[in-house]
C-alpha cells in the first residue's frame, strides 16, 4: 500500500526539530490509515508526561521511549527533543547513523526503537484520550 501524507498541507504548529525526525519514522512504520498524531495522546505515556503503569504494548513503547530519552539527557548538553540526527528509512527498517554513544545516535536509536515498536503493536481506539488521572496511577 502507498501512503500519501497531507502533513505539508495541514495547519500544524512548529515542533521541536527532533520531533520532525521522530514523526517521519512513525509515519514509516505505522499502518497507512493512522496518522502520527493519533499516537500523541494515547495511554498513559504516549504524549506529554506519563505516570503509572503502561496500559498495553503500544503504551509500553512510549514508556520505554520516555526512559530512553531520560538516559540520553544524562549526557552533558544532550536534549533529545531538539537534537537532530542522521538516519535512513529503507526496506521496512530504519538505520541510524553517527558514532555509537553520541547524543545524536542515542536519540536516533530511541526514536527508531519506539517507531518500530509502534508498527508492531496493536492500536486500541479505546486507549486514545483516556482519563489519565483515573487510569494511570
Curated annotation (Swiss-Prot):
Stretches assigned to coiled coil: none
GO MF, one example: calcium-dependent phospholipase A2 activity
Cellular localization per UniProt: Secreted
Origin: domain of life: Eukaryota
Active site: 65, 111
Expression (tissue specificity): Expressed by the venom gland.
Cellular component GO terms held in the UniProt record: extracellular region
Signal peptide range in chain numbering: 1-9
Pfam families cross-referenced by the UniProt entry: Phospholip_A2_1 (PF00068)
Keyword Ribonucleoprotein set for record: no
S-S pairs: 44-136, 46-62, 61-117, 68-110, 78-103, 96-108
Removed propeptide positions: 10-17
Recorded family membership: Belongs to the phospholipase A2 family. Group I subfamily. D49 sub-subfamily.
Subunit structure: Heterodimer; disulfide-linked. The A chains have phospholipase A2 activity and the B chains show homology with the basic protease inhibitors.
Role according to the record: Snake venom phospholipase A2 (PLA2) that inhibits neuromuscular transmission by blocking acetylcholine release from the nerve termini. PLA2 catalyzes the calcium-dependent hydrolysis of the 2-acyl groups in 3-sn-phosphoglycerides.
Protein name: Basic phospholipase A2 beta-bungarotoxin A7 chain
